[in-house]
Regions:
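S-adenosyl-L-methionine-dependent methyltransferase catalytic core, i.e., the SAM/SAH-binding region
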Residues: 1-296
Length: 296
């Protein structure tokens, strides 16, 4: 399954990559944005791509034909200030964060992100790497109220209490160890026809638990707090979010930076996909792109 980059032309307009520039892609995953950026910063440019997926980074390194100027490092984008210092790299001219999943990750990650037919037997790890505790272990002991709160807050699931109760009751009898196990428990807790067929009944719960398991909102807040340690003055950040909580964090952080004079908006309102892009790439439907230029 080929990964199609979301809002590609709009990202390029915000980043404005040019020959000799240094651009960081903190979520390099499928590499679609990266290829377009590389075409524009060479010759003379430098590129750093990071991702927590060790297999993906290994693949990118194996196919890298310019290791003196193009670097792929396994790491969390939240730690980019430390990664740049450790690797002896300067502050960047551009930073891209695409906070969505690549088609490859969703199709068969081996980590239980999806409950599709090809993924349902995957272990319920739900983490990008091995640094964080697998979700299957978290679910063995998480209190019912905390579980319900997470599913409601991060997934917007109205029936979070029903789902949390079903998970707790099920784990007393049998552990939830695969993606399919969790999906079955959630579906059984909800009435047929719930969501009116628009999405699978388990989708919101999977989203919520993935966000929790990887501290996705905490990572986003951390990199936003450290943006001046990643970007040089005049450097540009382009951030694509797919969830209202993520977008709100970016919106408020950019607003605070602009008010304090540390940065200026490229676009005050989020850029969204056109009808044509949504038709060709349904993943883009919920994407929102915000951009900012660092001044200090």
């Amino acid at each position: 399954m080929q990964h199609v980059p979301v809002l590609l032309q709009e990202v390029l307009e915000i980043l404005d990559p040019h020959p000799g520039g240094f651009v960081v892609d903190g979520t390099v995953d499928g590499g679609g944005h990266a290829r377009a950026v590389l075409e524009r910063i060479m010759p003379g440019g430098k590129f750093l791509g990071t991702d927590l997926d060790a297999m993906l980074i290994a693949e990118r390194r194996a196919s890298n034909t310019d290791p003196k100027n193009v670097f792929f490092i396994r790491g969390n984008y939240a730690d980019l200030p430390e990664i740049l210092r450790r690797e002896g790299l300067p502050k960047a001219d551009g930073l891209l964060l695409d906070l969505g999943f690549s088609s490859e990750q969703l199709a068969s990650s081996g980590r239980g992100f999806s409950f599709s037919e090809v993924s349902k037997d995957e272990p319920l790890l739900m983490t990008y790497g091995d640094e964080r505790e697998p979700l299957r272990d978290v679910l063995k002991r998480m209190p019912e109220k905390e579980l319900a709160d997470i599913i409601f807050e991060f997934g917007g699931e109205r029936r979070s209490r029903q789902i949390a109760k079903a998970i707790v009751e099920h784990r007393r009898r049998k552990a939830i160890v695969t993606a399919g196990d969790l999906a079955d428990v959630v579906r059984a807790a909800l009435p047929k026809g719930y969501e009116h067929g628009r999405i699978d009944r388990a989708t919101r719960t999977f989203q919520a638990l993935r966000i929790y398991a990887n501290d996705e909102l905490g990572n986003l807040q951390k990199i936003l707090n450290g943006l001046s340690d990643v970007l040089a003055p005049g450097g540009r950040a382009a951030i694509i979010t797919f969830h209202s909580l993520e977008d709100r964090i970016v919106k408020l952080a950019f607003r605070d930076m602009a008010k304090s004079g540390r940065a200026e908006f490229i676009n005050k309102k989020p850029i969204v996909a056109t009808r044509e892009e949504i038709r060709d790439n349904p993943r883009s439907r919920s994407a929102k792109l915000r951009g900012i230029i660092m001044k200090l």
